[in-house]
Amino acid sequence: MSQPTAGVPELLVGQPDWHAVLVKVLENFQCVTGTIHRTDPSTGLLTLVTQHGIPPQVLPMLLPKIDNIPFGKGIAGCAAQRKEAVQLCNLPEDLGGVAKPDARKTNVQGALAVPIVGADGKVIGVLGIGKMQTYDFNVHEIADLSAVAALISAKI
């Protein structure tokens, strides 16, 4: 893996292009799919800011479900509620019930979501990445993605 934050700070100047930020994060972590959600202060829901790599055949069905996510629902919602990283090394066979049935249709297997925490300690978003093969993210990768989320927290 390249330096996990490589190129990210440069993309966070001014008004960030969140899709470009996400694509750079995916490249750095050798992942093919990901999302950035922001917590909507008026609804308390995680609102989709951008996504990349969700297969086009499932996007129309999945988009309404990932557009606004309650804390505690799905991988991103669980990361937000728990205020800690949530990962699934084999999303289609998630036996813990974290992944929602429609998420399994993406064919993403290894998935990791980390909360984006603001200066006040509140969850202001979630950064999620995924691989198309079964994958168990190690503690260093989890810490690295959390470091990227900390960079994002200053701008989201």
What kind of region is each of these model predictions?
Residues 1-16:
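Signal-transmission linkers at sensory-effector interfaces
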Residues 9-10, 21-30, 36-40, 80:
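Short regulatory alpha-helical segment in sensory/regulatory domains of signaling proteins that mediates
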Residues 26, 35-63:
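GAF sensory/regulatory domain recognition
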Residues 42, 117-123, 132:
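Flexible loop/coil segments at beta-strand boundaries within sensory signal-transduction domains
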Residues 56-61, 89-110, 131:
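Signal-transducing coupling segments at domain and membrane junctions
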Residues 59-84:
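Acidic/proline- and glycine-rich, intrinsically disordered low-complexity segments
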Residues 109-118:
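A short, aliphatic-rich beta-strand micro-motif
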Residues 130-148, 156:
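Regulatory loop-to-helix N-cap segments in sensory/regulatory domains
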